[in-house]
């Protein structure tokens, strides 16, 4: 790479994370002759590269986390070297050269986490040393001469070594600010040197065997010491010397043996963090309440109880974190909940019984951890806090009002919810009402006075002649009313408020602020607005506004610069004129603004108007990998890159191929197809053609792009393949230099807004890392992206584009690597895929409609809050307040059944056998199997309606008709009588275990035949098991029997079978369904049929009709009828009453006698509701009384009321929003039933799909396993 590029202007670069093993260190680093700092962390270096010798201006070198065994090389030849960071290597004493300590400017040395056994020789010669880190080595002694010379040290870290003593010369370190000695066996070190270190700010002595006897008696002279760590020692009480520290802000005394605290802790008036975890504390002194600046208090793993916490702890008004886990707390003081800034409250592993109700008023709380407190009962939320949820008022009174209840009902519900009257509360309400009445009167008086004053001023203005003071006529422009426009989108609030120069550049019709470093540099094809702010003779702010026109500028830029210059004048309220300046013809006043130092640069931004250009697409091929979120890895454009285990995406611009290998997963194929759809939609404007290819079925055009079809497609990608970690660089541009630091995206400070906690540990790229004012280079090994922020300076963009090309050429990269440019807002889909949860969707508050958002803008205070209250989300809970549907009387059901059967002219049945429907035998009518599909063709008579004679017929016509002969009139009447009409309905019945092939077979075969036989008279009704049409059920006259399995397979089995006869809401909805053969399912209010088969040829078995003692007599008679019609004479039949069961066959056949229910009271109260958002808003609807297990929708919430409990059933695909809203609806329903049925209070229970209890399942007829998705 020639030195004519941008490399000589690079002042700093971070190449960490690249792989430089095996001699891959870039030679072009030598061209960075102006390099000041260089980071080579985690690059696999085993020795220092020779190219460092050319960097004569290098000041900072970082080679941490490598495999270096020596620092010998060219370091001593770098005269400007100031800092050497070589932590986490394999350095020994022999690998540290002596001559580096002769460098005059060496001030920072970090050799921590190495294998040193003693201090490096000649270290004392580095007299300008400021920072020295030798921690995590094996050093056992410090030479006395070291601290005689290194007296200017500011930071010293000797932690995790083997030091047993410290040299007395340490008292010479009077400038030392940070001293870290953690993890050294300093038992006999008295630390008498500490009082002499007057500038000390941080002192860490963790795990150094500190006791009361080996600490200084006083540290009063250390007035700057603010951070002390004495954790993991043997202290039995707080050392007295700590009470003398006036500036202490952070104190860590954790993991000691401290049993009590002194009252002297109130001397730490500036303390912000106090850690007393893992001690023996039983109580805290009341003096701790005086630490008003305390923000973090850690008391984990002590012996504190409720009495051990002072009642005045609420005085800690700055407290943000309180952690007291693993103690003996039964309660916490209520005053703790009065700390207004409390964000984190950790109380797990205690003995908590409850918490103060004030816990709900902690507005800043973010973490509340009360786990492993088995006896804890959370306090109820205040009523006013539970009223609204997702902007919906769930109070019982409001929902009754919305449901159309009478005012008396609403008032009664309010009385039920209010409970007993509180005379004290009534007194306070009256007092507040009185005060508010006075406030209203005062507001009315003030409003009246202000209206009078405004009217008076208006009259005075109208009466005054249009003359200025002194009798002079006002200028015409002073009488003009300036339009009230909002310029905040273009100019910030601080514009023109401080003396100085501010410049904007016109880009896409709007002004963009130019950084101060680029003032005086104008692009020939651009236009600028220049604002000079200064103080006039009177000390007031004044302004000069210019708009500069480039010689090559387009018309849109010229017009916008003039317009926005006037907008700026109006925004500032300035009276000056806007002055036009043209390139090459600037005025003297304009040149003086820049001290006659302006320069012109060729180029400029594109015009704001659209231009039509032919887009050039680069052909790329990507390998798709990943499981949950797919990632794309570019591969060479050749057939040998294909691997049968992966999916590949070939992007040819307007042709996109998705190639699926023979061993690739269907999931990745689908995700790759969706990815291609996004590319087509967002980048190709929907013009691209997407083709899905399967290995072995590729068209010739596909292989032409890849240079021909390979002889064999092999598995060549390693099983443990994972691409290198992406590296994100931020391009920095200063006066004559470039910098390229890496973004450590594991640190939250690098993000524009703090990301979610779960995304931080994984080193993931997040969109919040990108700042619109900056330019970034994303190095993904085989892809290099240059991301340009919308508000980034143009010079930085140009430098980044050039630097990205040179960086790609300098580092070892594959040949198919491409450098691409991405502008903010128009990023390619491949670029977005590198980031975690890239979000293109605008943040929208779905709890408010569009009109409410528009109306709410600009409102503030009480007006805004009132507006939000009126714009609540729609929610329909009316079904919860309707009475339960009463059961249909038996006489009415039989009458309806008779009418429907009178209209039935004929009924033919068909059953699916194999792949075709065959006629159902007559003896099997009424018998259905759960794995079969049935079709019933029903022909109904349609009543004939005779037309009445028209009343307007004239009398002459009547007379002539009467005059006809009798036979002719009779024949004519017979001809006019219409024929009786009919209608055909085809009922398709599908068992809950049957596949959808039956419906498809019926649709394409039998239905076509029926439509040809009965054109225009055919209606098809599709039904599933236990969700049948009542009219269809009526044709079987209550003898509707459902067996498990398939017809011919099940009929020959010798296993006992049990059937339950049950009526749901109406005699029309009576079914006899096979259930599990288990005596615990019996119920005294129902009738059951038990079939016990025999192996004998003469007698196939015995069948019992079991009649419960509390069953309905009509159902008992029906059970006997079903018994006789369901089984032929080959079975012995017997009707038995409850309590008369024979032991031999009945209890043996049913599987032994077990306890069972003796009543079915729940049948009189059972109701099923569905809670869903499918209508676009939250609504609750009630299922009919004839519901079944399949009515439980997996993506919704179901509410089941059995008269004692209200079960909230949660499906596996239910959203969190529906769960929260349904919980509120449950609470409203329970409140309503409490007001209607005092004698039957309901309890709320949660049921998840697959974990239903017996009390829940018995409400459903023939409960079984859940139905799988039909094939």
UniProtKB/Swiss-Prot annotation:
Source species: Mus musculus (Mouse)
Keyword annotations from UniProtKB, A to Z: Acetylation, Actin-binding, Activator, Cell junction, Cell projection, Cytoplasm, Cytoskeleton, Leucine-rich repeat, Nucleus, Phosphoprotein, Repeat, Transcription, Transcription regulation
Disruption phenotype: FLII knockout results in lethality during early embryogenesis at a stage preceding gastrulation. FLII heart-specific knockdown results in cardiac hypertrophy, reduced ventricular function, increased lung weight and lethality in early adulthood. Mutant hearts have shorter sarcomeres and thin filaments.
High-level lineage: Eukaryota, Metazoa, Chordata, Craniata, Vertebrata
Name assigned to this protein: Protein flightless-1 homolog
UniProt note on tissues of expression: Expressed in blastocyst.
Phenotype upon changing residue 1245 to H: Antagonizes actin polymerization in vitro. Homozygous mice have cardiac hypertrophy and reduced cardiac function. Sarcomeric thin filaments in the heart are shortened
Gene Ontology process terms (BP): actin cytoskeleton organization; actin filament severing; sarcomere organization
Induction remarks: Up-regulated in response to wounding.
Region (Interaction with ACTL6A): 495-827
